[in-house]
Amino acid sequence: MAELVFHTGPMDSGKSTLALQMDHAQSAHDRQGVRYAMHDRSGGARITSRIGLSVEAVEVTDSLDLYQDIVSRLSRGGRIDYLICDEAQFYRTKQIDQLARVVDDLDIDVYCFGILADFRTELFPGSKRLVELADRVVEPPVSPLCWCGRPATHNARIVDGKLVREGDQVGVGDIGGGSEIHYEVLCRRHHRQGITGEISRATLSEQTLPFDGSRS
């Protein structure tokens, strides 16, 4: 029986790598699949992992009907046993519903990969719907670490060196006004306190041991 599975974890937890491994494992057993991606880090229609692996994928746009896309491929004589859906947190709610229909009506396995919550600790709409509909929600086998060594559970948006808690849910590269943006995974404590790895290192560097240079 086909199922809808949501693999979710914070940034740097290897979700895209796992998606590529899943695709490889499925195809190695003579199963035919379709790969989907949205807002990939490469900027193109690909699934790209942080360790350098990359494959072509179908670009998911807001207007793409995933169920009809699969039906169209099948009607042309294609064989589809599974779907790999990367960056699924960005998918529209109705597209998650369409994926559930692919599982139920077409008996095709759907494996989704994505972040659960944004930098504001609010659920992405696509992820929220996946939690509501998925047959299984799976955490990645490898957990990233906060700079303090604790398991990292929160995604932080850093703008000009400072952690921010407001702004558009989706932000890539520059966010305008000459500001530089990047992301960092933190434990809940340091996300709540707004202490990033850079701030921690700066604080430590300012701490000096008492030393009297006049003594020999």
From Swiss-Prot:
Keywords: ATP-binding, Cytoplasm, DNA synthesis, Kinase, Nucleotide-binding, Transferase
Compartment annotation: Cytoplasm
Binding site for ATP: 9-16, 86-89
Entry's Gene Ontology cellular component terms: cytosol
Pfam families: TK
EC number: 2.7.1.21
A GO MF term: thymidine kinase activity
Catalytic reaction list: thymidine + ATP = dTMP + ADP + H(+)
Cystines in this chain: none
Listed GO biological process terms: DNA biosynthetic process; thymidine metabolic process
Enzyme class: transferase
Active site residues of this protein: 87 (proton acceptor)
The protein's assembly and partners: Homotetramer.
Assigned protein family: Belongs to the thymidine kinase family.
Protein name (record): Thymidine kinase
Organism: Cutibacterium acnes (strain DSM 16379 / KPA171202) (Propionibacterium acnes)
